[in-house]
Amino acid sequence: MAKSKVVEKDKKNELDNQSADIELKGQSKNEESKGGKKKVIIVESPAKAKTIERILGNDYQVISSKGHIRDLPQKQFGVDLNSLKLDFEIIPGKESVVEQIKKMTSGKEVLLPSDQDREGEAIAWHLSTILGVKGKNIITFTEITERAIKEAVKNPREIDMNKVNAQLARRVLDRIVGYMISPLLWRIIKDARSAGRVQSAALKIICERERERYRFVPQKYFKVWIDIAGLKAYLTKVDGKKIKPTDITEEISKDVLQKVKSVRLVDIDVKEVRKNPPAPFITSTLQQDAASKLGFPVSKTMKIAQELYEGVDTKEGHTAFITYMRTDSTRVSDVAKEAAEKFILKNFGREYLNESSEVASKKGSKTKGKVQDAHECIRPVDVNITPEKAKELLDKDHHKLYELIWKRFIASQMSSAIYKQYSYDFESGKYVFEASIRERIFDGFEKVYTIDNEPSEKHKELKVDQEYLVEPKSAEAQTTPPDRYTEASLVKTLEMEGIGRPSTYATIIQTLLDRGYVVKKRKTLIPTILGFVVNHYLEQRFPDIVDKGFTAEMEKELDEVENGKKDWKEVVKSFLKEFNKDLERAKNEFFAIDFDTDITCEDCSGNYKLKVGKYGLYLHCPNCKTNKALKSDVFGVIDGNKLYVLEEQESQEENGEKNSVQSEESSANSGNRKFYRKRRTSGSKKSSTKSASSKAKKK
Ligand SMILES: [Zn+2]
């Protein structure tokens, strides 16, 4: 069982360090008084410290700072907007930790591991600044294994200030937006929590999808098909021209049903289709796959992945299982590639080996010695710890995620799956029906991992020119609006739009949920009315902040700071120049929340208005002057300047609950409670929403 959070403490040291709350192992008081070990490694987490200490043994003392130790002040702004001088302070509560670290490192060689990203580099920079250590004291690795750690301590490097600056710029931009906009937001919407830079762009994406769904007008169409020899052939052509399914009208359907009595098989088209193995996981794809296959929210995935990376207690000792989990690189190190190839050869055979991966690894060895992209994909640190073996070492959830990572990685190094695709064309007069099936003739990577659970269907031995008597069938269908986002599909969209980075996807979603701007129902993300109101305000007053293009551009500029192509202060200053204009206007111009709604007043025939008062959002009838509370379980869409309430309906599918375990996407689509827009009426019919109808005191 994994008990990563429980770190054994040396009793004696626990007494010594009680005040400092520092994890310290394997060092006796005697050693300390003699000067003890010469080299000290400071890491952020106790679990990581334990794994590294186990690897390096007696020459090193490994201590943990337990997360960040220095940041912008909690009670002041901390940024001089002219000079961009930053006023950092020790995070309250961390003073004693810092004192302890200072004591333990004085006169010793200090090594600071930096995860392969900006945040890790910044933490190392804060520490080295506080401790006053200079020179080559940064060590880097993407996995906490004996090979990687021993290699890392042999090759320390200097701090990469470009990386640190990119992180400082991000911190300052977020600080400016949060600190400047939030008070304005509170002035207008008392129960708004705050505004964040990247979350605001994500909120807008979610609100826009809801609006799109609301505006969506379903289109009726007909599915027309024939059943022949176990095949389902759909109408695909009329008069020699392809017809889109949604273009099949009732007229066409009726005509087919009336006229088509027999069809002739005119063509069988057979072609080979190769399904290529997926790339190994990066942060975003891991989050999506764990959501759809395991039903894990992204925050849970990241928490477990971090524990697997840092190391967990197992019956065979404290061990790390995977490489660093925040990455957008699919690169695989030569060592890992070789290990995977050996594993595949031994367990599956040569035909299962990805030919291109062999070529790639040979190429890779030629370029050895050259500086390479330091980042790597998310993969097992040892492919020989198979999911079966890991089952005995890990608890259920850790094992599930590890199994997914292991399978995806092995699959990425395997050969393509090969399918034969059979298309059967049946003709009757001007109509052509087509049936298509795929038969798998070689499983390849699908031996260990599936992308889409495609069934393999046996092809049918049919003869061209054969006539068949048929009874065409048809069913009415209608187009459906785009789905609401799930956590998985939102991460995919954020990545596609270039908003956020591997380290921020989980935080973005969590922040929107924590602030009550978005709620999660049946795994889908639904904007609340408060979320819509906040988004409306930001759209009106700070259009850049919620603009996905602008946010993506900022991310690119931060990348350029990291690559040394831009100065971080210039990036922040040019942002401030535009931002200040919006800020001045927002400060000086009156802004009121006053939306029309489609909710009918309970006391007269008028419609309520949505307003904001001392206690938050409420409904007001301008006709009879009564007020009603707006209940939190009411959902709606703000479109134009009007709030349209959505009605919750029970849907027919009863099996939504069962599906949710296997597939987030499928449960999102078949959940048994859905919100529908009210039928737009011509004005005479009015309905009041039940959920908004409880009486509230007048404000
Ligand atoms: Zn009224």
Swiss-Prot record:
Q: Which reaction does it catalyse?
A: ATP-independent breakage of single-stranded DNA, followed by passage and rejoining
InterPro entries in the record: Topo_IA (IPR000380), Topo_IA_2 (IPR003601), Topo_IA_AS (IPR023406), Topo_IA_cen (IPR013497), Topo_IA_cen_sub1 (IPR013824), Topo_IA_cen_sub2 (IPR013825), Topo_IA_cen_sub3 (IPR013826), Topo_IA_core_domain (IPR023405)
- Per the record, the domain of life is Bacteria
Q: Where is the composition biased (Basic and acidic residues)?
A: 1-15, 22-35
Q: Where is the Toprim domain?
A: 38-146
Instruction: Give site residues, Interaction with DNA.
Output: H68, R170, R171, D174, Y179, W186, R326, R515
Q: Where is this region: Disordered?
A: 1-37, 649-699
Q: Which cofactor does it need?
A: Mg(2+)
| Active-site positions on this chain | Y324
Annotated keywords = DNA-binding, Isomerase, Magnesium, Metal-binding, Topoisomerase, Zinc, Zinc-finger
Which intervals hold the zinc fingers (C4-type)?
601-624
Q: What is its EC number?
A: 5.6.2.1
Subunit notes for this chain?
Answer: Monomer.
Per its record, how is this protein called by name?
A: DNA topoisomerase 1
* Organism in which the protein naturally occurs: Fervidobacterium islandicum
- Lineage of the native species? Bacteria, Thermotogati, Thermotogota, Thermotogae, Thermotogales
> Gene encoding this chain?
topA
